[in-house]
């Protein structure tokens, strides 16, 4: 059963429940809870300890990142990522299923899906509908901690799926890539503040289009169909046959653009990891666009 879905970006709650019932969890199939919430709201690790998908390990994105960077969620090194996921029992032969508990149905899970892909691991899927629908459908949960046997994971960075500040700056001149921002429209325009952060005005990179990631999800928290997703890209005049860079505030919801494009048959969307957090502090003022009070971000 597992081998039929190794390269699928999404797996259903029904499929995962059947896999757990059939005893498929182990070195060949691992489940990760990648929940993260803004400070002062929900506590991701505490909620995981109280209830999670049976056999799931907690993927702490605060630990699996570049903690030396001044920006929020920058990728860790190859060695850091390899050691971290290896400690969760994941090898290069493991099919990884990622979910989170966000009320939208999915928030941080696509970021972890992309992290695995950018480090060379293709057998990774997002649980469609997330923990929200796992609970709604009455699938089993447990508070029992997962203790997988450590595994060896070799990480190889795929630079084609990652863009740096310098590359995005160069792209303003070359225009080789389309640039799409996944934040809510008000933050993109600069008319609404960036939440939970001081010293970061809202706005966007000059020349970027706006595709709020929430539009990729149904009201019930599932990914929309490939046909619906293609229509969203077409409506924003984003050509899926051409190179594409996704950006947001810190490289998280940009991964929803990468996932949506993947579901439309485009697996090569690159994510600007530093995104607006880095751009705001590094880029020339004329490359930052805002309709806020100052007119510039």
Swiss-Prot record:
Pfam families: Rhodanese. Substrate binds at residues 187, 250. Its EC number is 2.8.1.1. InterPro entries: Rhodanese-like_dom, Rhodanese-like_dom_sf, Thiosulphate_STrfase_CS, TST/MPST-like. It catalyses: thiosulfate + hydrogen cyanide = thiocyanate + sulfite + 2 H(+). Gene3D superfamilies: Rhodanese-like domain. GO terms for molecular function: 5S rRNA binding; thiosulfate-cyanide sulfurtransferase activity. Contains two rhodanese domains with different primary structures but with near identical secondary structure conformations suggesting a common evolutionary origin. Only the C-terminal rhodanese domain contains the catalytic cysteine residue. Together with MRPL18, acts as a mitochondrial import factor for the cytosolic 5S rRNA. Only the nascent unfolded cytoplasmic form is able to bind to the 5S rRNA. Formation of iron-sulfur complexes and cyanide detoxification. Binds molecular oxygen and sulfur. Monomer. This is Thiosulfate sulfurtransferase. It comes from Cricetulus griseus (Chinese hamster). The lineage of its organism: Eukaryota, Metazoa, Chordata, Craniata, Vertebrata.
């Amino acid at each position: 059963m597992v081998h039929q879905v190794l390269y699928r970006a999404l797996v259903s709650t029904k499929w995962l429940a059947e896999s757990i019932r059939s005893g498929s969890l182990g070195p060949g199939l691992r489940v990760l809870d990648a929940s993260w919430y803004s400070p002062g709201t929900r506590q991701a690790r505490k909620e995981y300890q109280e209830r999670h998908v049976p056999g799931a390990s907690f993927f702490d994105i605060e630990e699996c990142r570049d903690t030396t960077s001044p920006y929020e969620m920058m990728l860790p090194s190859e060695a850091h990522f390899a050691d971290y996921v290896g400690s969760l029992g994941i090898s290069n032969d493991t099919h990884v299923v990622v979910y989170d508990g966000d009320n939208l149905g999915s928030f941080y899970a696509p970021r972890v899906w992309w992290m695995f892909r950018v480090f060379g691991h293709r057998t990774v899927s997002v649980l469609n509908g997330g923990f929200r629908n796992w609970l709604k459908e009455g699938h089993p949960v447990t508070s029992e901690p997962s203790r997988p046997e450590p595994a060896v994971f070799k990480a190889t960075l795929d630079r084609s799926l990652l863009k740096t500040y310098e590359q995005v700056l160069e792209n303003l001149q070359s225009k080789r890539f389309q640039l799409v921002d996944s934040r809510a429209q008000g933050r993109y325009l600069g008319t609404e503040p960036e939440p939970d952060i001081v010293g970061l005005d809202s706005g966007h990179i000059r020349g970027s289009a706006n595709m709020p990631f929430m539009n990729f999800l149904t009201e019930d928290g599932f990914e929309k169909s490939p046909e619906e997703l293609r229509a969203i890209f077409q409506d924003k005049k984003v050509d899926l046959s051409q190179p594409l860079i996704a950006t947001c505030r810190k490289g998280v919801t940009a991964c929803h653009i990468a996932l949506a494009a993947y579901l439309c048959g485009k697996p090569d969307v690159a994510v600007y990891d530093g995104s607006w957090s880095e751009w705001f502090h590094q880029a020339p003022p004329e490359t930052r666009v805002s309709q806020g009070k100052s007119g510039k971000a």
